[in-house]
Amino acid sequence: SELTALIQTDMIFDRLEKMRDVFVFACFTGLAHCDVAGLTKENIITDEAGQVWLKTHRQKTSEVVDIPLLEIPQLIIKKYQGMKELNGKLLPTLTNSCSNLYLKEVAVRCGINKTLTFHMARHTFATTVTLSNGVPMESVAKMLGHRNIRTTQIYAKVIKDKLAEDMNNLATRICGDYSIQTSNIAI
């Protein structure tokens, strides 16, 4: 998958590695660029059961979001922990426009034939990471900071559209490979 390619591809330049890491972090947290850029270590909380959480306010809506952190975002945080040039920030972020420029290079390096934008990370979290893996829509809505579940349902429609497209492509590929005898069936 494209997400696997992003995670596993070796980046030849430090700036591209940092960009890729921040983008992958967003793919696994669903945060918008401005929200990732504002994170500090104070946003990371470990509860009494040992679960690591990311707690922040969405800049766009002021909604509080609590996101249980999977292993990949935790590893990315550890990778950049203590870097002096972060000036107290959690991750090495750039402006949104500069990030999108670097993401074009990251996509080429990973063999992804589309223009990556930072907002695609949020979309990837909603579709590829959560909804496609059975996370309930209500939980996804809460983690994305959606006030209205209808906003989250847009992502679910994208998944249904993609499923239909994939099955239609499959039907085209296997057309004629299988047949069923219908002469004895009364209609």
Language-model features, listed with the residues they occupy:
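Basic, Lys/Arg- and aromatic-enriched nucleic-acid-binding interface segment
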Residues: 1-33, 133
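Conserved tyrosine-mediated DNA breakage-rejoining catalytic core shared by Y-recombinases
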Residues: 1-7, 38-78
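Short basic/aromatic active-site micro-motif
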Residues: 18-22, 93-97, 113-133
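C-terminal catalytic core of tyrosine-transesterase DNA break-rejoin enzymes
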Residues: 24, 28, 34-35, 105, ...
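Catalytic-site neighborhood detector that most strongly recognizes the C-terminal catalytic loop/helix
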Residues: 58-62, 96, 144-169
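C-terminal catalytic core of Y-nucleophile DNA break-rejoin enzymes
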Residues: 59-78, 84-105
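C-terminal secondary-structure termini that scaffold catalytic or DNA-interacting sites
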Residues: 83, 170-187
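Acidic, low-complexity interaction regions
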Residues: 94-97, 105, 110, 182-187
